[in-house]
Amino acid sequence: MSSRLGAVPATSGPTTFKQQRSTRIVGAKNSRTQCSIKDNSFQYTIPHDDSLSGSSSASSCEPVSDFPASFRKSAYWMKMRRIKPAATSHVEGSGGVSAKGKRKPRQEEDEDYREFPQKKHKLYGRKQRPKTQPNPKSQARRIRKEPPVYAAGSLEEQWYLEIVDKGSVSCPTCQAVGRKTIEGLKKHMENCKQEMFTCHHCGKQLRSLAGMKYHVMANHNSLPILKAGDEIDEPSERERLRTVLKRLGKLRCMRESCSSSFTSIMGYLYHVRKCGKGAAELEKMTLKCHHCGKPYRSKAGLAYHLRSEHGPISFFPESGQPECLKEMNLESKSGGRVQRRSAKIAVYHLQELASAELAKEWPKRKVLQDLVPDDRKLKYTRPGLPTFSQEVLHKWKTDIKKYHRIQCPNQGCEAVYSSVSGLKAHLGSCTLGNFVAGKYKCLLCQKEFVSESGVKYHINSVHAEDWFVVNPTTTKSFEKLMKIKQRQQEEEKRRQQHRSRRSLRRRQQPGIELPETELSLRVGKDQRRNNEELVVSASCKEPEQEPVPAQFQKVKPPKTNHKRGRK
């Protein structure tokens, strides 16, 4: 009973479960610390029970178990039992727990935390933090490097001072490459011993030919390429500009006060001719219309003006030739051959014809670019399409889901389609079926087309300038205007038919004899009127009437298919 009683600490009052647990943990820690000391570190005697000392000494260095008797007796328990430890001063001096219950130093707490982290967490109520290892890189960064020391008056010292002052040092050989460290500069100088390429425009030196070409292309693209006789080689110049545009994506103006850039060679050349010039010089460069004197800045604008305002572009008469033709003289070419005046005039007229062709395409791309109508406003009629029931459409959709294709239902037709819309369009023009669909008809020239894309292309290419109504004041749609025009044509046909019938009725009246002079005049008028009717009303398919001679007027009237008239 003594051993069992000795295992549980005696308390003066009722104790809770947490207090008992904390005392057990403290006792276990004391046993571990005391096991590291000599066996005679704690020497005590129990006056009443000799067996207790042997059992306690035997269990002092044993591993801790869940059984309460295996725990080392705590200082609180020994105090309650009036047991005085022999080496109390030694334990306190070595950092142990004092009799007053003070907490151990931080070093021993960390050792206990590494061995039993969960118990540490339960005892002190602290959060369990993950074990972190110091980063060697961060420690290396914290170490401040000492500045390098170079010999006084050496190049390295000069380079170092320049790096400290400006942030970088340029290569003394090429003066084109900069480095931020002396080691990088030395590494560059090992490969910078070759012959340098010098730009003949600005004197800059580059190490590679590709770098020199890119430098000239990017910074000196406005300088033309000259031939041997200081003449501009235009094909080579355009080829160079084309290469620059392909690599850089744009051509920029090289004037200091101009920051314009262009994505086309024509726009760049047009800008270069006029950039930086005064109003007087620009006025001299304008092209004036020889009909009305209206000035234009470009040749294409003048050609469009001549085509739209003054009809087709015609050749200039001798008296009205422009000054550029009058000033042409017999100048020798670079090859020594003399070009004739007629050849120069022919070249000029060919250029005018080329500009006229350009003017045909130019308004469609520039002027009417924002005015292109949609498909609903194009002037053409659509033919009627066959109608299908919902059962047939559902069957077609099912076949497409199963077989991924559908065949034309008309006998003898082997057309296969992968969509219902494609089959519908095919059935509208299939000749093997019962449905006869019409054709797409252009309402501007009455031309018929099989496909809708064909009539659209025809209208956009042939009738590009007739997309819209001629009269801009009207607000009616094109369909209404076409209906009104058809009504007017029908009314005109009816009037002509009515006039012809009235003339026939008058000639067929019996018992009326006219004198020969009046009869001859009457017959001449009838002949002229009949000829006009044949020309105008050819679509009405009126029966042709032969001219009646004057001598047969009284004997036999002309035969007609009309049964109306007085008998």
Swiss-Prot record:
Q: Care to name a GO molecular-function term for this sequence?
A: DNA binding
Q: Enumerate the SUPFAM superfamilies for this protein.
A: beta-beta-alpha zinc fingers
Q: Where is the composition biased (Basic residues)?
A: 119-130, 495-508, 556-567
Gene3D superfamilies in UniProt: Classic Zinc Finger (3.30.160.60)
Q: Which GO terms describe its cellular component?
A: nucleus
KW Zinc (keyword) present = yes
| SMART domains documented for this protein | ZnF_C2H2
Biased region (Basic and acidic residues) positions are 523-532
* Biological role: May be involved in transcriptional regulation.
Q: Which family does it belong to?
A: Belongs to the krueppel C2H2-type zinc-finger protein family.
What this protein is called in its record is: Zinc finger protein 512
Which organism is this protein's natural source?
A: Pongo abelii (Sumatran orangutan)
**Taxonomic path:** Eukaryota, Metazoa, Chordata, Craniata, Vertebrata
